[in-house]
């Protein structure tokens, strides 16, 4: 058993069914442990339920049964939004950026939701600029997002995921919409951040190259999770 000092996430016996119109078992008795500083890749065929699992682990979706503990806190309906805001960062395939806002405003959005001051010169704004620097986009800070390329948008989404200094980042096909070269750069930035700052990463991908860069690989087959 892992020591609890480094365990950031523990999922136990997660089950998820959908009904349309008959019952379909999406996830069956899925259990997973993730340590601080660990990067976990979950691969599997399309339609296996990878994104559903990621959303459950990230507290965005409710399992039918099973337990989820993040940072030694058992997730419940009463604490999950606070835990999500304080401990979790998300990177989605489709970016989910606000197109009429600047790159910096998008990066600072989690801080704004958390009611932190994002005024010019504030520590939070300085952190936003530092994150844009880390992803190589400080020159684009005041550009509206709609003017930027797909690769730039995904790097902004990555910087935004890091804004509240989360302990764990969940990434759903983070390079799914990017060309090979841009995807490679994105993977480097993501993993450098995770390993350099002792964060944890759980990502869903069907890119074997990206999966190999992670410290642990799992495969979802017929609703069951297997370590590779």
From Swiss-Prot:
SUPFAM superfamilies: P-loop containing nucleoside triphosphate hydrolases. It is an enzyme of class 7 (translocase). It holds the Pfam family ABC_tran. ATP binds at residues 44-51. GO terms for molecular function: ATP binding; ATP hydrolysis activity; transmembrane transporter activity. Keywords: ATP-binding, Cell inner membrane, Cell membrane, Membrane, Nucleotide-binding, Translocase, Transport. Signal peptide: none annotated. Its EC number is 7.6.2.-. The complex is composed of two ATP-binding proteins (LolD) and two transmembrane proteins (LolC and LolE). This is Lipoprotein-releasing system ATP-binding protein LolD.
